[in-house]
Amino acid sequence: NFDPQHVFDDCKYIYVLRFDFAILIDDKVIGIIEYDGKQHFEPIDFFGGIEGFEKTKIRDNIKNNYCKSKNIPMLRIPYTMSINEIKDVIYEYYLSLTTAGCA
């Protein structure tokens, strides 16, 4: 199962942070997927410019550290990947989660 906009009540930065997708088996999160748009790599006016970029980096670090502390594998997909590359990397990631004893 995939759960879009998944939240963990204890993962917060001012408010509860949303993860783009959680992969679940038997209602247990076995992996997280985050799609990182351009605003994750450089300031974009639409997303708050420099201040928004700094906050995005803080939220990304909180999410990274949260998953690491909970032993939840996380896949970050940069906006620079093509659709075909994204399909391939998600497929490989899913296989690694479901065949590595995580399921």
What residue ranges belong to the model's regions?
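Nucleic-acid endo/exonuclease domains
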Residues: 1-103
